Amino acid sequence: MYRYNRSSPFERTPEKRVSRQESQRKSIELPKLPPLNTRNSFLDDSDNGTDNISIGWTPISDTQQFQSPVPQAFTFTSKHSARGNGTSSSESTPKSTKYVKERRPPPPPPLLYSTESIRIDSPMVSPSSQSRERSPNKLSFIGNSEERHHMEYISNHSRILKSPFANGFSPNSPKSPRDSSKQQAHFSDESDLRCHEREKALPPIPFTTTLLLSPFDDEDSEFFTKPPPPLSTSRNVSGNSRVSEALESVYSDSDYTFNNSNARQSSFNSLLGAKPLELAPSITAPTQPFSIQSIDEHKLYQCDNVYKLSAIYEWILKVYFEWFNECVFTKIDLFQIVQLLLEFQMPTNFDQDTIDSNVDNIMASFISQKAVRFDIINDEEVAVVVGGLDITGVFTELLPCYSFIDNTYGSTNSLICYSNVCTHGQSSGFRKEIKLSEIINKSVGLWTEYWHLTPDDLAEINPREVQRQSFIFDLIILEERSLNMATAAVEIYGKRFDKSLLPDEPEFKALAFDIFEPLIQLHTEFLLTPIFWKLKTRGKFIDGVGKIYSKWCGEAKNIYLNYAKAMATVHEIIMWEKKNKTKFVTWLKEIDNSVEITRSKMYHDVIFFGGFFKSLQNMPVTLRSILKNTDPSMEDYEYLKIVIKEVEKLNFEVNQVHGLAIDHRKLVRFSKQLVLSTNSSNATSYVNVGGSTNANDDDAIQDKLALGLTYPERKLVLSGTVYKKRDLWLDPTPVYIALLDNCLLITEEISKGETQKYKLIERPIPIDYLSLEKRKIPGTSKQPLRNYSQKEHKSPMHNFSTPINSMRPLLKSSGNHMSTAYGDRKTSNTEISNANPNTDEFSFKIRNTATGESFKFFTESAEVLNQWIDAIMESFKRNAENHDLNAFEFTVLSSEFAYFDKDAPVNLPVAPEGSEIDVALKAYAQKANKDSCSWSKTTRILCCEDVKFEGRIYLFVATTDGIYVKYRDDYGSGFVKILELNDVKRMEANVKLGLLFVLDNRKLCYFNISTVVSRYLAQGNTLDENCIVGTVIRDKVRFFKIADDFGNSKHLFFERKGKIVILTPEFDQLTNQVKYFKFYKEYKLPSSSNNILNNEIEDIAIFRKSFAVCTKKTVILYQDSFEDNGIVLPSFLNDKDMMAHLRHPHLNSLPFKSATDSKKRPSIESLTEEAKKDIATCKAIPVNFFQISQSSFFALVYDEAVVKINCYGEMSDWRKDILLLDFCCTGASFHGNHLILVGDNLIQIYDLKNVEQNLGELVPVQIIKGKKIKLASSERREKTILVLSHPNILNRQLLVACNPVAMADHQ
């Protein structure tokens, strides 16, 4: 079809086109053509000679299935029989025989009979028996848009087509030899010119039979005639019973759909044609779900006029009523069927968006003409197809090409066809790629100027349309400017750049200049090319911008993200070079002053710092303006709404990635400037967090620190210069600190040559160990961290009036009374400052909870202080999100006890939002229902014990003032003192014995639990009226423990005068209460000759047949079967090197390295070896001894390491069985297969469920930070109660319980 360069509202041009010769892109004046007889060209001639054929299968007898010729009365004469059977039609218009020859052959019908049962003149022939003659330059195509739409029009010469499946015959052979010779001569002239059609190839037809049948004779015209009806009692099982699988169907007749039918009926009885009831098709309710895989190529073959809604409707009726009448079709099934049909019939290179839009249009037309409806059955939309309707419609985007039927194809042909399926237009490359020079050398300008519109022309156009088209041109101008900028970066800056300008940045050219090439290709191919094509084909009113940009968004994400990452590096390099005034900066100025750049104003800051970022930001603004002037009924309206969100999302992602890349680039630059001496103690990395080190690695120093500064995921949160507080009232010294996402680095600036370096002066602090502390003002109970700088630093003098700031009195110098905040940096930093005013103004304090080191920093303003505090708190929050699955949760038991002034911490630890302590405090505040500061008792908590007695849980707290008790879950009432004991070291309750054992001032005594509880319940009476009397068992006792199952009985263990004494309780036979404890056994502790200089006991681990005593020096294992002196654990009998070391005569005089010296060695193996020597020589302090998960392995906890031993007391491999600790462990408990290690400022929890795992490879599953943490529970298994400093209330102790988190809580 020919079309001038004028827009048409009924046509859509797909975005992608194959390029054509450049000469055909020019605007041409086409001669006016006579009006085309379009109805005879590509529409149905459905009203000529149609017969009224009723619905149903035409019955034939069994004897007539494959026999004599059929009477003429049963021959189809409708448009379908003329098309499919090849009968002549005097009313058909002349047609090029090229279409007849290259028409896609229909698929053969399935074979139902064997070779013997099929007659020679049977219409059923195997496809494998065909011997088709094909030209070597012709390919087999199906779905050819030029051939498949016009077979219903036959030439004026009367002819009958032979069966397309007969051997040796072409399916398009003419009946007359004279006609055959003429057509073959015409075909030979055109065969070479039309060999590049872009259509789908015919897939193989899945037939397994290879029957060889004889071809039909030329005179066997009876094959294409309708067979006679069968007998009324016979079942139609002939080939025609499944004729729908081949060429025709009963639904192919237009009478069924009443399209232009002269015998339209109105009753179902008349539709059946008054046939006998047994001939009517059975009506059954469909029950089977439909599968799109059931639609094969045979069925898709039977609808080739997909541009006509009536043809699609007839084909849908076959699918619904005939082929799959037992299936239930959902809404999505019907859409998929139409989608599959169009994709099958259209060429493979056909635009997918055009297919998708036409699928929607086809379904919308069916619904509007009430041919399809959707009923909701069981919450599912079921499709219902209505038959017998007059359905009409033509889809212009699917129309075939009919303009070049009688025209020869030549390079000099100036005619242009705009059909989407025109094979000539596709093969000749009419839509060629737009050259970049055509875009950057000229601009389209304004819409009115481009089309030379006068005010009179604009007055006739809708103002909204004028605005809409003007904004579309604004998009074009925006794209042209972006491409001009990218071309300047590649052609001018890129080609003139020399790598010698940046010798340390070898990838700068690829990141700064080559990165623009994919952007140029992206914008040219997906934006400007389709938009300019629309300008040429649609005229002044173009549409479909939203769909174009939607495609662009799908392709632009990865390219733009790479561009954002590259520009971050380019920005940092340019800024760095400008700061140092290198020769690269001089080169940039020379390029900026060149003629090309001055004329185009594409300076380096415009290209590299603005670039495509600005165009991406302006894009959704312009698209939103187009949307406001777009009518909601237009198809592009929804596309614009979607694409605006997609572009905004892309813009957000690009900005986010660009920001992260900038931060990472700063970190890379900082890593190049970081200086560290390998002999410094700072070269040691942490063991439990942040990775490990290896002495054999020759990597950079940063890798030895396990900081991962060059890792892509590493982030630099904040960095800058602050002032660090020093001792002896010296002026603060400036330091440069860098907060990373995994650690905090404290450095000082140094000059090394012409560059600036940063020397690491303190050990890096991991985020897991970093704690932020704040100072409280007396009289305030709780202060939010957000107002930290505004409240605490409001006045520089308020800190000097507090009695808890522990500051020395100010010394005023008689010679100089002037003071500054941080002193003069030019003066010596070692000079003593007598004034030191404003010391705590704008300051914050951090602490390394692993080492206990603290650092106080000062900032120059409150704004900088808030930046640091917010950055640190945000780092805490992100670190907590990475460990969202906690093994334990904490419950606050009480906050009623206060510190003595000398024990109270000066600064309070900050509990980050969402941390375990913060969550526990919030839950406690809701339960308490009162001010937590309303009551407090200044004392020191010594130990705790919770007792479950008579269905209630009582919490006993031993302090220096006595023993207090209350209901554990009662947050409304406070503690009640019941026992006047002031030096309780240990307290343990045994409910089975009904006794509370207390070790007070080295006196071991016990009280009756029922008496103690009764005293608590009688709170109204005074202590003098109801005195509680206990029984003293022994004096001079330093430790005791109760065993429920040692030697199959209960025993009392205690240490007295260097011996472990075991007592057995004796019960009263009448009251079943304990009368007294009698002696059972006695074990001697090792003497000082075995290097046991201190027999102070930390704990006793009791098992069924043995027990282990943890002293301050070592662990001794005793057996129950006999009395011996015990075995020292761990045993090194399997370690020859260590045994030789222990037998060395000069062992005690060897100059062993100190702990500080050992930490200078960065090797984990060397540190492990040092820890093993400390354990063997009794330098490590034992903390506790546990059995791991009821296995044959045991865990020995020391202050600096954890050791796993087997049942023989040996380490299988000391390199794998020793876990080094980053902190000094003061207490340990074993709770639910988890090992809880407690330090002064840190709690680490390890999972020991997998006993086979190497202990040295374990990492903590949970880390809790605090201050003045102490393990308070006397029982160290399955009970863990801790005491720590309250993070929000001054001088307050916090009593918390550690409970395992259930799996349901994780989920």
UniProtKB/Swiss-Prot annotation:
A GO CC annotation recorded here is: cytoplasm
Stored CDD domains: RhoGEF
Q: Which GO terms describe its biological process?
A: fungal-type cell wall organization; positive regulation of mitotic actomyosin contractile ring assembly; regulation of cell wall organization or biogenesis; signal transduction; small GTPase-mediated signal transduction
Positions of region (Disordered): 1-144, 164-194, 219-239, 780-802
User: Per the record, a Pfam family?
Assistant: WH_RGF3
Which GO terms label this protein's molecular function in UniProt?
guanyl-nucleotide exchange factor activity
Q: What keywords were assigned to this record?
A: Guanine-nucleotide releasing factor
| Cysteine pairings via disulfide bonds | none
Stretches with biased composition (Low complexity): 87-97
**Residue ranges occupied by any PH domain in the UniProt entry:** 715-877
Regions of biased composition (Polar residues) lie at: 1-10, 37-79
Enumerate the InterPro entries for this protein: CNH_dom, DBL_dom_sf, DH_dom, PH-like_dom_sf, PH_domain, Rho-type_GEFs
Q: Which residues form the CNH domain?
A: 938-1279
Q: Where is the composition biased (Basic and acidic residues)?
A: 12-29, 176-194
Which Gene3D superfamilies does this UniProt record tie to the protein? Dbl homology (DH) domain (1.20.900.10), Pleckstrin-homology domain (PH domain)/Phosphotyrosine-binding domain (PTB) (2.30.29.30)
Q: Which residues cross the membrane?
A: none
Q: Which residues form the DH domain?
A: 467-657
State the protein's purpose: Guanine nucleotide-exchange factor (GEF) for RHO1 that stimulates the exchange of RHO1 GDP-bound form into GTP-bound form. Required for signaling of cell wall defects to RHO1.
Q: Record's domain comment? A: The DH domain mediates interaction with RHO1.
Q: What protein name is recorded for this chain?
A: Rho1 guanine nucleotide exchange factor TUS1
Organism, by scientific name, is Saccharomyces cerevisiae (strain ATCC 204508 / S288c)
